[in-house]
């Protein structure tokens, strides 16, 4: 009987896992999603702090830390050049910012003890655990590839919507809406699912089982950041080249 009671209590704890509770600030009559802002500011502070440490005293013979950041920069350049082509240079900061923000955000969900900070409603989690963040990142990507196409081709950029035949106009327009949606939902779904799986396993077996899952989550979080940055660069390159 005690075993059944413990199992039922475990299921009850799992049923209490919340996905949709939010904590809001009221600013000038508007509701501001405070959880995302707080965690995003922490991630931005980590990135800015790391950047300051990396560039404050550069050495001719790089130190271990400088070597690491130079490797990251070279990796981002390679991704940008592969997807965009020879005109990749101006887009390295954008692609790099996307990759690093998503990467650190994803890892913060597993490595930072967000839940020790008590909120009136909901709880803190990785910024990319919220659909508002992933949609915002996807919309920024949309603005970037429209800007890339318009800056390269002018108004002639819009001729792609009637190629190879005007009949495809609705489909080509719909494609530009589905690109950011697919980016945002893929990232949101993977990060949310990873955190929920860890929470459920911790509720059932709190000591051993969640550890391998957390390591797997760190790996997949890095892959998701790379996929998002790679697809963003590919969309920008596609808009500049004008092919599908």
Curated annotation (Swiss-Prot):
InterPro entries: ATP_syn_F0_a_bact/chloroplast, ATP_synth_F0_asu, ATP_synth_F0_asu_AS, F0_ATP_A_sf. Keywords: ATP synthesis, CF(0), Chloroplast, Hydrogen ion transport, Ion transport, Membrane, Plastid, Thylakoid, Transmembrane, Transmembrane helix, Transport. It is found in: Plastid, Chloroplast thylakoid membrane. One of its GO terms (molecular function) is proton-transporting ATP synthase activity, rotational mechanism. F-type ATPases have 2 components, CF(1) - the catalytic core - and CF(0) - the membrane proton channel. CF(1) has five subunits: alpha(3), beta(3), gamma(1), delta(1), epsilon(1). CF(0) has four main subunits: a, b, b' and c. Key component of the proton channel; it plays a direct role in the translocation of protons across the membrane. Its main location: plastid. The keyword Cell cycle does not apply. It comes from Gossypium hirsutum. It comes from the Eukaryota. Belongs to the ATPase A chain family. CDD domains: ATP-synt_Fo_a_6. It is a multi-pass membrane protein. NCBIfam families: ATP_synt_6_or_A (TIGR01131). One of its GO terms (cellular component) is proton-transporting ATP synthase complex. HAMAP family: ATP_synth_a_bact. This is ATP synthase subunit a, chloroplastic. The chain crosses the membrane at residues 35-55, 92-112, 131-151, 196-216, 217-237.
């Amino acid at each position: 009987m005690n075993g059944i009671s413990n199992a039922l209590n475990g299921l009850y704890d799992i049923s209490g896992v919340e996905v949709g509770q939010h904590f809001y600030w009221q600013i000038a009559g508007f509701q501001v999603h405070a959880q995302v802002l707080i965690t995003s500011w922490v991630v931005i502070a980590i990135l800015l702090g790391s950047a300051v440490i990396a560039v404050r005293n550069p050495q001719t013979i790089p130190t271990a830390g400088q070597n690491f950041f130079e490797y990251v920069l070279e990796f981002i350049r390679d991704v940008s050049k592969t997807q965009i082509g020879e005109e990749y240079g101006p887009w390295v900061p954008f692609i790099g910012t996307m990759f690093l923000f998503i990467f650190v955000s994803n890892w913060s969900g597993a490595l930072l003890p967000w839940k020790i900070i008590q909120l009136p409603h909901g709880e803190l989690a990785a910024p990319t655990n919220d659909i508002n963040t992933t949609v915002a990142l996807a919309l920024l990507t949309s603005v970037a590839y429209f800007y890339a196409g318009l800056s390269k081709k002018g108004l002639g950029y819009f001729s792609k919507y009637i190629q190879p035949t005007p009949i495809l106009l609705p489909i080509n327009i719909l494609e530009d809406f589905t690109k950011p949606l697919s980016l945002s939902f893929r990232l949101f779904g993977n990060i949310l699912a990873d955190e929920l799986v860890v929470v459920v396993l911790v509720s059932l077996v709190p000591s051993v089982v969640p550890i391998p899952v957390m390591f797997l989550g760190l790996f997949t979080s890095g892959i998701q950041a790379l996929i998002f940055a790679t697809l963003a660069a590919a969309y920008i390159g596609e808009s500049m080249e004008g092919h599908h």
